[in-house]
Each structure stands twice: as structure tokens, then as C-alpha cells.
């Protein structure tokens, strides 16, 4: 069995992408001195260094990297060593211009950025094998080596190529996936619009067409592109396993739905030795700490509930959004420790030292342009001390309460053209249901539709347009065996080939929900509907309505107006020992909370309404009865959290975000510890006070 934790790293990981090739070697000594001051335990190296490591085909220059790894080892810093295959050198593209990717419109990308790769290119695969093999042979036994980091952020910025090499590869993939051209015709429904194929050679990638292309073909191409990238990862991984046994292999995911939509992370999670993730706050008006928690929960779920590692996030502002605000004092540590609460075994950043040149020179870093006399640096040092104080949580697992079903294949299918309402967004529904669960202080596991759900009292399906028959059976068995299920509209509609399930909607869910949908009637942008329910309570919906016909389900809320006035809007179906709820419109936040609360009662989940809003409460537990409570106060008010048992506060008084650092002189709390200076090991009992902006971590006594 492969190693699943960084080799030789016995603390929480703390550090970042280190790009010393951007600086004179005279700076390296200062770097390692500052790393020791900050408590850095690991850095990622060499991710974009292919042109320096292999300046011409087959000639390797590892001298500078030898000196660097020796220096890091001398100072006790572990190394996450990259295979630099995300950025082939200019000489490679000069020799193989066909390896540059082609868009669906037929435009070939040019050299001069990163990630410009056709993953079907035989020349690219051979070159990647060469540099990976050379690195593995040279550094496989280096004492600083803790982890292999293959490529970088697969799936962005290029998720698919449409060149002739990919066309040939796609045809081979289709034969492996379907077995025959006749099976492809059946799966794609090529009888529609006269698209029948007589041979594989007639099939091309779904390039630009006069109108909407075949949706099943487009869906298969998404699968093919993801599988092709995964083939290349496996090729590098297998080389590293063979030549450097005992060193785990990873690649950095981007699981946040706001940051990558082209990778099936359920499949990728099975390929890496250690799941790692990059996460960046999106300045799109959403509550960023909720998006962060969701990404962390999704990453942990991709890891099967096991500990994972945050490999990149930012100390402050980024540089690639329309507006890139700085993080407020204390926010960096709250972000970092929120990831740790939800299963990460540390907090790594992009990057160690802020670049003077290049596309990301305005992206924040651990060592900013202003050096060490800056708020960011002081917060970095404080966070390093805080992570050292939390070393004992290593190896524990986050404790979940409920599950949310998510499937990338369904997302891909729903995002294809010509759907009933383009305003129905799977990501928006997932975000909204997650936010409702978050505000009810429930920790979420994400789950594949065909996975074992028996551990969860409540399972939510926010958007599952594509559902296999196996997934439908799985959800039915879950409810029959005592589970509580909540399903949102436009779920269970098509099978794995984007073909509508036979019979009335929602085909894969009719039995478990006890209803059929005769027709849906999407709403216009300015339309709202009122929904009346128990005790005169009213809910509000928009975007979508349906004509629901109960077939065993009871009507709980009814449309009071709109196209489906008088008909069921929210239903409840008792099946076996469990209950299935169905929501046929897009509810606003208050209305959605009412449904989740009612379903939670069915599931026997105790209300946590006494906990304050925007105070994040998460537990980790491990062998030997170890239990830890993380309390992160994202609000501007001090908060009190009731404790069922006594415990011991673990974090030191590492003051960050004090009044001197804030523009208006108002304390925003501390990065770790508390504003009042709780010393390490202070007993707490009955309640835990968490100042505004602060983080507390308690070792519970039982």
C-alpha cells in the first residue's frame, strides 16, 4: 500500500510554493532563515521549472535544485517536489507545435502562458515521461523529499483539446467505452437529426456546429477529456512509485465548484496517494467563509473522509479576479484553520515570496513585497505558531452530520444547451442547500449518488439532473432503510447518456418520491410564486414550477399562485422506515430553511438554533478517544458556544489583527487564541467565549 502522508513530516504542513529560480541564490539563505522564523515545515518546489531543469532535449541541469534541496534539508524543511509537466519549454513547442491545444472553434493556442497542452499528444507524453523519470532517479532517495507533486491544477486553464490527435484518441476511447459504432449510435441517439455513423472514422470531437451539437456526444467528450488527463497523471505517478517507493504522489485539485468544472474528482480521488487541494476566495458577493467550508468538505469527501492537505490558498488578495480585495486582519488564519477543522493536515500557500515579475506579481504571498515589517508577515508567523500548537490533531477525522449528493457528470450534462430554463444552475442549488445546512451548524459530507449512505440520517439532493438506475435504487434503499431524503427539482431526469428515463418525470426518482411530474413551467425573471403550508406559513419561490401529481406522497406545501396554483409544491413520502421530501421550485433562503428544518425533524437531528450565526463549529475525532472542537467566529460580535463537556484550549495567544492593524482602530480578534489572551492549556467548561474574528480549538475531555 502506498504512503498516504508526506514522508518524514511529523507536524502539520505549513509553507507554500517556493520558486527560488525567480531570485538570485543570495536570497536563498534569507529565505530559509525566515522559514525557520515562521515555523515553515514544507515547501513545494519545481512546479514550473522544466525549462531550467531540461534546457534542451535530454540534457538535464539539476545543479541548482541539488543545492536548494540540500539547503532546505539542512534547515529542517521538507520538500513537495513538482514534476514540471504543466509548463513544457519553448524548445518543446518549437519541435512539436502540434502539441499546442486547439479550441472547439479550431483556434490553436500559442506558447507564452502555462498549461497549453494537448493531453493526447504523443510527443508531450514522451517528454513528460523523460523529465519525470530523470527527476525520480535523481531525487527519489533525497532526504528532504516528502511528497511528489505531479503537474499543477489539471483541468485549468485548458480542459479539452479538439485537434486531430484528440479526434483519433477519442475514437479509440469510444470503442473502449461502448464496444461498437452501433452502441455509440444507440447511446447518442443519432437517429435524431440524421446523425447516424457507419464507422469510427466518421466521428469527430464536438467542434463548433451551426446549431446545438449532439448533447450525448458532448457529454462523452467531457468524460474523454477528463479520462485522457487522468491517463497522463497515472503515467507519471507510476514512474514515481517505481523509482521512488515510499514517497506519496499527489496532484493539486481545485474542488470548489467556483474554480473548476472539468474534472471528475470522485474518479481522481482514487488515483492519488494523498488528496490535496487549492482554494481561493471568490469576490462574487457570496459569504466567502461558506464557500471555503463547502470546498473543504467536498475535498475531504473526495478523500473518502480521510485527512487531506490544503496545498494552496492566499495570505491576502489574489490578482486574477475583476476586484481583488485584501483579507482583513485575522482572516487569513480563520481561512487556514477552517480548512484544518474540516480535515486538512496543514495550511500551504501560493506562494512563499511574492514575485517581482510575471502574471502573478500582485498575488499575495507569505513574504510580501514589503518584507517582514508588514501585517501579512506577522500573521504568517503567528499562524505558524498556532499550527505547531495544534500538532496533536494530526490523523484525526472531521465528524460529519449529513450528506449532500454531488456528481460532476450530472453537472456537465445539465450545463449543456437547450434546457428548460438557463437560470436553473446546479452549482447555485448546491451552494444554497449547503449554505442552509451550514447555517444550521451541520457538517456536510458530499457523496456520490451510488455510494453507501447508511451512515447519514439526512441526505440532500440539490441538483442531480443525470441519474443512473443504480443511483435511483441506492436512494430508494436508503429511504426504505430509515433515511430521510430531500430532493430538489429537475433531478432524476436523464440516464448516463443524457437520454430521458422512460415514463413520466422524474424517472429515476418516481418510486422513492411517490409522485410524477406531468410538466414543468419555468418562471420568467421577474416572476415569483407564493407557497402556502402548515399553520398558514408561506414560502417564496422563483425560477421554476412544476405540475406535480402525488402517487403516494402527501402534499405539505401548495402553490398559492403561479402556473401550478392549487397543486403540490413540496411533498413528503413515507417509504419503508424512512421519508422522502420533494421541492418543486427554487426557494429563497428563509423558505429553504423551513423545508430543511422539517426534514431534519424527520431525521431526528436535534436543532442547533442556539448557536450564533457565522460561528463555525466543527469537530475532529481520532483513535484513543481524541475529540477536538473548532470554533471560528466569522462575525463582528463576540460569541458564546455551549460545551457539553469540559476541555482544554490548545491555541497560544498569538495576537494578529489587533487594533493597531485595523484602519479604524477596532479590534477584529486574533488569528489564533483569543483577544483576551487565553494561555495554552487553559481549562474551559460549560461554555466557550469566542471573540469577534477569533478562532478557538478545544481538546474535549470525552
Named regions from a protein language model:
Residues 16, 35, 43, 72, ...:
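Conserved, mostly hydrophobic/aromatic
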Residues 9-14, 39-41, 73-79, 141-146, ...:
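Short, well-ordered coil/turn segments that N-cap beta-strands
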Residues 200-203, 207, 246, 273, ...:
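Carbohydrate-binding surfaces of carbohydrate-active enzymes
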Residues 22-37, 128-134, 257-268, 328-336:
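Short, acidic/polar
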Residues 13-25, 46-63, 110-129, 151-159, ...:
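The substrate-binding groove and active-site-proximal loops of carbohydrate-active enzymes
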Residues 30-37, 42-108, 136, 235-243, ...:
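Aromatic-lined substrate-binding rim segments of carbohydrate-active enzymes
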Residues 2-27, 32-42:
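An acidic-aromatic substrate-binding cleft motif
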Residues 105-274, 278-292:
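Polysaccharide-binding and catalytic clefts of secreted carbohydrate-active enzymes
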